[in-house]
Amino acid sequence: MSGGFQPAANPSIVQTQAARVPGRAHVLVIGNEKGGSGKSTTALHIAVALIGEGSRVATLDLDARQGTLSRYIENRAAYAQRKGIELPMPRHAAVALSTLPDRGAAEADETARFEAALAPALATADFVIVDTPGSDTHLSRTAHVWADTLLTPLNDSFIDLDLLARIDPDTLKIVRPSIYAEAVWKQRQLRAIQGGRPVDWVVMRNRLSSLAARNKRDMGNVIEALAKRVGFRVAAGLSERVIYKELFLSGLTLLDLKRGGGGPSLTLSHVAARQEVRDLVTALNLPPPAPFAPEAAPATEASTPVPPPAG
């Protein structure tokens, strides 16, 4: 752990609502340096929920090699075409890793790719949802600097929590923040240097069991303590349900089941799960859509974005 990392000494760094930067979309980055935390599922459910509220939504997949979010959206488009129905669709783009052998050149190439995909989304959407890979990559770090809201899905396991903090096994006290918490802090610092507004970091407890197990209670206590030390908000995520895996092949979300079209029948369990999605969107406390400035670049122009000015 580098000596430069410091906990959030000022409580004001934890925002109750991330401020919208005038004239551009609000960027929601879904980040966690561990695969299998439900980032892509969460991304599409939030996107569909926001579209249902009347917002214009763009999605970016930075894990183009695995491409879970991209395939999810492809499956969705194919399902709608097969069934002859209309489904809410975000404007989607995938950003591939550079193949250049030189590291510096590759990172510059990836930055350019990311900015080219981000620019039209910033200019034409109300929200840009960025799905990041479950590993530390240059693309992921670049996206984190742009986050107005950072959402970190966290499986209810001390294995997953280890990315945020080292925990004493006997006392369950926080020994020190861990690799991802440090990475987020560094990106916060870089954003501040570039004149960006404070990031609203939200950690969602994902795949919660319905059982009142001791592990669940201990996790809750540790996460609440860590939130105060590192500087994030805690939100209830999505419970562990088979339906999420079943919906992937059709590209559907729980919010689509009421639309018909041959999808799974709606059960009481699905109704409860759908409410979890809505509760999550509410907990994010995203800013309302705002009119774009007249000088905003049209979607067809690949103007290079610059970090937002301090507000």
Positions of PLM-derived features:
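C-terminal lobe/tail of nucleotide-utilizing enzymes
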Residues: 1-22, 192-311
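Walker A (P-loop) phosphate-binding motif
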Residues: 17-53
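Generic structural signal for small/hydrophobic residues in well-ordered secondary structure
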Residues: 35, 68-69, 148, 238
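Short, well-ordered alpha-helices that flank and scaffold nucleotide-derived cofactor binding pockets
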Residues: 44, 48-52, 74, 145, ...
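Conserved catalytic-core segment of NTP-binding enzymes
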Residues: 53, 133-236
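Short, flexible helix/strand-to-coil boundary loops that buttress conserved ligand/catalytic motifs
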Residues: 73, 163, 248
